[in-house]
């Protein structure tokens, strides 16, 4: 933006998202298929369909596509009742995401993300953590508060970290171990602020390895499921990996 005069002139602010990882289009197709919509006919999808009388994390997915050659729109039950929606499983994640260490879009003028904190998760509408790095935007937000068109609570740095604690573990300790594995195999990896390390319990190491395998296999097995025309095939292939991953959370501390 600084180097391109047109961008510098026209783009006044950059807004960033707190990101867990990026999904491929197969993530949307997986939702559609479970709702009875042909996966390659999706016309529109809302990944965060708010469901009243639920918590912020119990949102649904709304998909518009074809069922029996008829255009239809369907809304799911809370996503935690659907297969493959646990974000920690990393289904359909891009490999590049495993080497990203930027959680809060650090170069953005303003960053927003889910406020996964006990005091906010009961609101089904959801609540955002907002990190402001630009004085003009900070003044706009303050004006909104004074005019009562915006509600903001001041929270601590520790609260921000807690709201994304799993993300920080994956992008710090997890990244350190992924760098260690890459270096052990002699593979190139981008330079990172985190140093490679294997100093963690074996079952935590296994968890990080299984996350990589879950991401990798999800792409392959879903494509095979599309060819076979069977979503059950995808479930059958992924379930053993999911169970192995979940078992890493049953180890003694």
Predicted feature locations:
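Flexible, glycine/proline-enriched loop segments at strand-loop-helix junctions
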Residues: 13-21, 84-88
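A short alpha->loop->secondary-structure connector
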Residues: 4-16, 37-38
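Long, compositionally biased charged/polar accessory segments in the mid-to-C-terminal portions
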Residues: 40-253
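Short, solvent-exposed amphipathic alpha-helical segments in soluble enzyme
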Residues: 2-8, 31-34, 145-149
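Short beta->alpha junction loops/turns
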Residues: 1, 17-21, 133
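Short, charged, surface-exposed secondary-structure boundary motifs
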Residues: 21-30
């Amino acid at each position: 933006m600084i180097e391109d005069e047109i961008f510098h002139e026209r783009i006044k602010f950059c807004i960033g998202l707190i990101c867990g990882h990026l999904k491929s289009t197969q993530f949307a197709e997986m939702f559609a298929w479970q709702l009875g919509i042909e996966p390659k006919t999706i016309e529109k999808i809302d990944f965060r369909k708010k469901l009243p009388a639920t918590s912020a994390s119990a949102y649904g997915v709304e998909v518009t596509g074809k069922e029996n050659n008829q255009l239809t729109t369907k809304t799911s039950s809370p996503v935690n009742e659907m297969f493959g929606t646990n974000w920690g499983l990393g289904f359909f994640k891009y490999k590049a995401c495993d080497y990203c260490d930027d959680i809060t879009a650090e170069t953005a003028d303003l960053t927003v993300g889910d406020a996964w904190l006990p005091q906010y998760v009961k609101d089904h509408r959801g609540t955002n953590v907002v990190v402001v790095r630009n004085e003009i935007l900070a003044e706009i937000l303050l004006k909104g508060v004074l005019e009562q068109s915006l509600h903001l609570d001041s929270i601590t740095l520790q609260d921000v970290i807690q709201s994304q604690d799993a993300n920080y573990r994956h992008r710090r300790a997890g990244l350190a171990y992924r760098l260690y594995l890459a270096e052990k195999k002699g593979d190139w990896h981008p330079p990172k602020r985190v140093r490679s390390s294997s100093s963690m319990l074996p079952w935590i190491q296994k968890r990080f390895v299984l996350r990589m395998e879950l991401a990798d296999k999800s792409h392959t097995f879903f494509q095979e499921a599309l060819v076979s025309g069977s979503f059950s095939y995808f479930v059958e292939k992924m379930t053993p990996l999911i169970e192995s991953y979940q078992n890493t959370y049953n180890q003694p501390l």
